Amino acid sequence: PFPKTLFLEEHNSSKGFTRFRIPALVTAGNGALIAATDIRWDICGDGAGLDTAVSRSTDNGATWSYTVANYLGDNGNRFNRDSTAFIDPALLADGDTIYLACDLLPAGLAVANAARYPAKAGSTGYDTNGNLLLALSTTSVNGLSSSTARAAASYDYHLEKKADATSESCYEIKNNSTSEVVDGDYTIDDHFNIKSADGAVDTNLFCGDTPYFQFPTDFLYITKSTDNGATWSAPQLVDAKNESEQVFLIGPGR
């Protein structure tokens, strides 16, 4: 569970976190200050279990309240080479609407410091309709395999938003060739959490134990707030990377 107190005075891993990096700051239409940062838990490096905190102040910075805009928590609130990472948040204010964009790295991936899991060029990660491409996890290759093995997998499936989408049941996985929904009786919500009816699957599509995994690259992950940073919407994935690019990264700041 996420700690009740976020910003403490000491870098002490016994309190569940130690470090924050990559700040961003904007002023909302009502004058509120909105700040975002990586929660880097017990490391300073990139990847391997990072999340996103957003703080807001309505009194010109005298006091602050925070929320966790992006959080998966796979493998606990700590460094783990098999974990996902939300990294490098960037903020954009458009009146009272605030947009938060960051890079989402699937389980184990990083750009500069991952010998086994470097992000790969060779695919945008999406089909021609902008749907997230997926490969079936097997004993041979899955969401925790090396990025080389993942890149060589067959991406025969895609994630498609349902016609009758709700927050609890938003997406379905379809076969690229037949457009049929895959077996497994899965429910996938608007944050890409996936569960099976029999309880055997209860994870997120970007975590290492997903039944269907993505091409090993980063994904542009965007949420928005329409109440000056108090709450945040379900995410949208944006297809912006070229096949020849290893990654397409957000430049954080103000």
What are these regions (language model features)?
Residues 1-254:
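Asp-box/BNR beta-propeller blade signature and adjacent active/binding-site loops
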